[in-house]
UniProtKB/Swiss-Prot annotation:
Belongs to the cytochrome c family. It is found in: Mitochondrion intermembrane space. GO terms for biological process: mitochondrial electron transport, cytochrome c to oxygen; mitochondrial electron transport, ubiquinol to cytochrome c. InterPro entries: Cyt_c-like_dom, Cyt_c-like_dom_sf, Cyt_c_1A/1B. PANTHER family: CYTOCHROME C. Electron carrier protein. The oxidized form of the cytochrome c heme group can accept an electron from the heme group of the cytochrome c1 subunit of cytochrome reductase. Cytochrome c then transfers this electron to the cytochrome oxidase complex, the final protein carrier in the mitochondrial electron-transport chain. Keywords: Acetylation, Electron transport, Heme, Iron, Metal-binding, Methylation, Mitochondrion, Respiratory chain, Transport. The gene is CC-1. GO terms for molecular function: electron transfer activity; heme binding; metal ion binding. The modification N6,N6,N6-trimethyllysine is found at K81, K95. SUPFAM superfamilies: Cytochrome c (SSF46626). GO terms for cellular component: mitochondrial intermembrane space. This is Cytochrome c. Binds 1 heme c group covalently per subunit.
Amino acid sequence: MASFSEAPPGNPKAGEKIFKTKCAQCHTVDKGAGHKQGPNLNGLFGRQSGTTPGYSYSTANKNMAVIWEENTLYDYLLNPKKYIPGTKMVFPGLKKPQERADLISYLKEATS
């Protein structure tokens, strides 16, 4: 598996489309918005997994204690259930490096 440092440059516009079709049914990025089936992702970068106030995380997600950055998200988004065994996230992942890079590029803009 290639690392984020080897990933292609991300396109935030393409990432927004990916978010809307594959993520938005469970997540939002809007500041102050409530949680959906998954946690609100606003303020994601630099935050420890399992710590968004008001969201009920799996024990596995809380115990993983990963800090969400480009490199950790790149690995996580390949296969969330493999990265955090026991996570409640049902999304199977994004296998294409370009899609992961695009989504991360969008999330960097949309969640800050």
